[in-house]
């Protein structure tokens, strides 16, 4: 039996694409909020390792029961794995400082990626930046500044980390756009998962072998902490995160293959809305006024850039 979501789309299906996109961002926003919640119980490297193992199991089961294992072989391995490396670095910066910043700062920092895509499009893709894109960049810069609040006494590098994540996410988008358009969603997810697994294994080994100052370990236990005891609670969390991650990424990949990206991309920003809702449910937190205005500026900039690509 083959699932429709894995078949090659023969025509645009905007309603199906919209539903898939909303399901995808809903699942990923839930996962990302859960990761912040779990920073006191696990480490980034343990999380990546255990989650990746479960995702690999799910991928092979899905491939076996739907399209077969041939779909997992990339047509262009080098760009596929280069993109996966960009995503792995992106996640390192996105989750690395999660215990020190708000969920709103995490999400809005990551969603500066359309601004970086615009900046990188000229040197890497040969695209020209017109006045609308320049205005969007200015608006996005204002939003990022409001979000970072660099003049505050409590400002730290942790607040910059999600924006660096946005830069590497932009590299992923550009590689995907130029070299990976014909790859299967399962192929792309498999490559990402394999790279995440390697990052988890080598990161765990590095943290164990390299001697770090105890103050450094104490300030970033999620990133530099030793491998914690693998409890049933952590395993359940990693299994849940694996399911949410796989669901979210498959839905988003298929959504952008079954409708115009210029129509869907503005709706991608509903991730920030879902992230805010999950943050309220799990942490009882709501964004501050400056964070809210910053998010609005970043979303507006992304929408302007998207519509000018039509």
Task: List the predicted regions and their residue ranges.
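Glycine-/small-residue-enriched transmembrane alpha-helix faces in small-molecule transporters
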Residues: 2-46, 154-178
């Amino acid at each position: 039996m083959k699932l429709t979501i894995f078949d090659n789309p023969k025509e645009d299906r905007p309603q199906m694409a919209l539903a898939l996109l909303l399901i995808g961002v809903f699942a990923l926003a839930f996962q990302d909020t859960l990761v912040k919640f779990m920073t006191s119980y696990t480490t980034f490297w343990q999380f990546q390792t255990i989650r990746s193992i479960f995702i690999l199991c799910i991928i092979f089961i899905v491939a076996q029961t739907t399209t077969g294992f041939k779909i997992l072989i990339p047509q262009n391995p080098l760009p596929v794995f280069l993109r996966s490396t960009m995503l792995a670095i992106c996640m390192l910066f996105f989750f690395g400082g999660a215990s020190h910043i708000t969920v709103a700062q995490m999400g809005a920092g990551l969603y500066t990626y359309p601004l970086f895509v615009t900046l990188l499009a000229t040197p890497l893709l040969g695209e020209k930046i017109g006045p609308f894109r320049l205005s969007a960049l200015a608006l996005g810069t204002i939003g990022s500044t409001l979000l970072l609040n660099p003049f505050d006494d409590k400002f730290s590098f942790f607040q910059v980390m999600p924006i660096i994540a946005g830069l590497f996410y932009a590299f992923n988008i550009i590689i995907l756009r130029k070299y990976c358009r014909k790859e299967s969603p399962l192929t792309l997810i498999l490559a990402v998962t394999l790279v995440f697994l390697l990052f988890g294994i080598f990161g765990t080994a590095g943290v164990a072998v390299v001697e770090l100052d105890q103050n450094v370990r104490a300030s970033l236990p999620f990133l530099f902490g030793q491998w914690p005891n693998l409890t049933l609670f952590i395993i359940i969390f990693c299994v849940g995160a694996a399911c949410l991650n796989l669901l979210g990424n498959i839905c988003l990949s298929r959504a952008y293959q079954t409708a115009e990206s210029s129509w869907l991309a503005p709706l991608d920003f509903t991730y920030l809305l879902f992230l805010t809702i999950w943050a309220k449910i799990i942490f009882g937190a709501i964004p501050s006024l400056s964070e809210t205005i910053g998010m609005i500026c970043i979303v507006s900039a992304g929408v302007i850039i998207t519509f000018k690509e039509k």
